[in-house]
A protein has these predicted regions:
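Alpha-helical multi-pass membrane segments and their bilayer interfacial helix-loop junctions
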Residues: 1-294
Length: 294
């Protein structure tokens, strides 16, 4: 039996040293502090809305937003600190849009607010090249499309179906770009979570759309089915090529959930029988998945 390598070099590769822990805690606490500050501002307005005059409502948000931008622009702080501060300022933009809409009762739909928020965020995302800010931008863009779908598009129409699947392909395109950047070395290893989160969002969203289409008789099934087959095939091929356990595990599991949804929605069995056979499908499929992967 071979002995495990317990040399200092091996331990150094596995465990973080004191300097790395200090750096992690500094960044983590800074991000949490900025997040709680922005959340505190939002709850402050929610609690004191009736007591604050219009000037104070708009003035507080604008002063904080301008101060954040000035600190990012004219200070010599660490680049990461500036990026986190600018990400916090991005949420202040959304707060400003919401406050303005509530004060003057503009009558705008929710997707209008998120559309304006998205447009004002894209320049900062491009300029800073900061993964959390890019994630915020992609999330805002997808939320805008979904809100438009819910409020404007007709239920189960081609417009709703195509726009919903457009969200899937936005996440897929972002995944492809970040995977390519990671392969070419243009993406920091510390941002690998960003790639995994985008790919997870792509898989979950296309699976969700397909399961919804399966459960609703009047829904258009062809578009989400084609998207799911194409994306699952491409990601399985890529996962096999680069030996990525993430893709090889999550896609078969998503396919298992789609199969289970199809069985439940199309079967005429009683609840107890559905529960029993559904459990058999999940246990059998999960066991086979673990056996194949390991």
């Amino acid at each position: 039996m071979e002995k495990t390598d317990s040399s200092p070099l091996s331990r150094q590769a596995l465990y973080a040293d004191k300097k790395q822990w200090n750096q992690f805690l500094s960044v983590f606490l800074l991000a949490v502090g900025v997040g709680f500050t922005v959340a505190g501002i939002i709850f402050f307005f929610a609690y004191n809305w009736d007591e604050l005059p219009k000037f104070a409502k708009l003035g507080i948000v604008e002063v904080l937003l301008i101060a954040s931008v000035l600190l990012v622009t004219f200070t010599r702080w660490n680049k990461l600190v500036k990026q986190i501060l600018l990400t916090g300022a991005t949420f202040l933009i959304g707060t400003l849009f919401a406050v303005f809409g509530q004060i003057y009762q503009t009558g705008a739909d929710a997707y209008d607010l998120f559309l304006g928020w998205t447009l004002f965020t894209i320049l900062w995302a491009v300029a800073t090249r900061f993964a959390p800010l890019w994630l915020t931008f992609i999330g805002l863009l997808c939320t805008t499309i979904w809100l438009y779908n819910i409020q404007i598009a007709n239920t189960n129409s081609w417009e709703m179906t195509l726009l919903a699947n457009a969200v899937t392909w936005i996440c897929a395109l972002a995944t492809i770009i970040t995977e390519w950047m990671s392969t070419k070395g243009h993406l920091d290893r510390n941002n690998r979570w960003f790639v995994s989160l985008l790919s997870l969002a792509t898989i979950l969203h296309t699976s969700f759309l397909l399961m919804m289409a399966i459960c609703e008789e009047s829904a258009i099934l062809s578009v989400p089915l084609i998207s799911t087959v194409l994306l699952f095939s491409a990601e399985l091929w890529y996962g096999w090529k680069v030996k990525s356990l993430f893709y090889l595990a999550i896609i078969p599991f998503a396919a298992l959930m789609i199969l289970l949804t199809t069985f439940i929605s199309q079967s005429n069995l009683r609840d107890v029988q559905i529960f029993f056979y559904g459990g058999v499908i999940v246990i059998t499929g999960t066991t086979l998945l673990i056996y194949i992967i390991l």
